[in-house]
Regions:
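Active-site pocket-lining/capping segments in soluble small-molecule metabolic enzymes
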Residues: 1-73, 91-92, 100-201
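Conserved nucleotide-cofactor-binding alpha/beta core module
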Residues: 75-77
């Protein structure tokens, strides 16, 4: 609660991320965490799991819900389905082209948001099993070990990272995105030692 007040006094909004998949045994605790965030004054919750989104909407009808990029909303129909569930903003899938972003934003009944800087997954965001298979840490449960960032042999070479995509960097496209109607743009702070290579899409 103190942290939320600190942010609000300085004109910042607080979005609490609950963007992971939950099972039935965890649902009660997930909704309790959402209530704790709501009671603390969070401005919105960022969610991935459809069942948890429904449970939170039933328990906390007034807290705004934002669909995480992990929800893989990559078309207008998906965004509208999320809107029918009470989602008020869709963080669009990072894999979309500018034209796809513009079309969805122009026709969506809710706000849209896009990432302008951060990692791009080798798989489609929210659909990767690589970390779970290799390191028993599921990227769909918030525990990605980022095995795609490691070196792999390719034609006998071990000095390359064939699965590690260059980071997404749309900083020079922010005005263009705003002109298309996108409501928000996000970036993710990178950990020390994280590959820094980036290029515009």
């Amino acid at each position: 609660m103190k942290a939320v007040r600190y942010c609000h006094v300085r004109g910042c909004k607080v979005y609490v991320t609950l963007n992971t998949l939950v099972n039935d045994r965890e649902m009660r605790d997930a909704v309790a965490a959402a209530k704790l965030a709501s009671d603390a004054g969070a401005d919105a919750l960022i969610v991935q799991d459809l069942g948890m989104s429904y449970a939170i909407r039933c328990a906390l009808p007034d807290i705004p819900l934002h669909a995480s990029t992990q929800m893989s909303l990559h078309n207008l129909a998906g965004v509208e389905a999320a809107a029918e569930m009470g989602i008020t903003r869709a963080v669009l899938a990072r894999e979309l082209s500018f034209e796809q972003i513009r079309f969805i934003t122009k026709n969506a009944s809710i706000e849209t948001e896009v990432f302008v800087h951060g990692a791009l997954c080798f798989c489609h965001s929210g659909q990767c099993y690589m970390s779970a298979l290799i390191g028993r840490r599921s990227g769909n449960r918030g525990l990605c070990a980022q095995p795609c960032r490691l070196q792999y042999s390719l034609g006998g070479r071990m000095d390359d990272h064939p699965l590690s995509l260059k980071d997404n960097c749309l900083v020079d496209q922010i005005r263009r995105l705003e002109a298309s109607g996108v409501h928000r743009h996000s970036h993710r702070r990178l950990r020390q030692g994280y590959p820094r290579a980036a290029q515009p899409r």
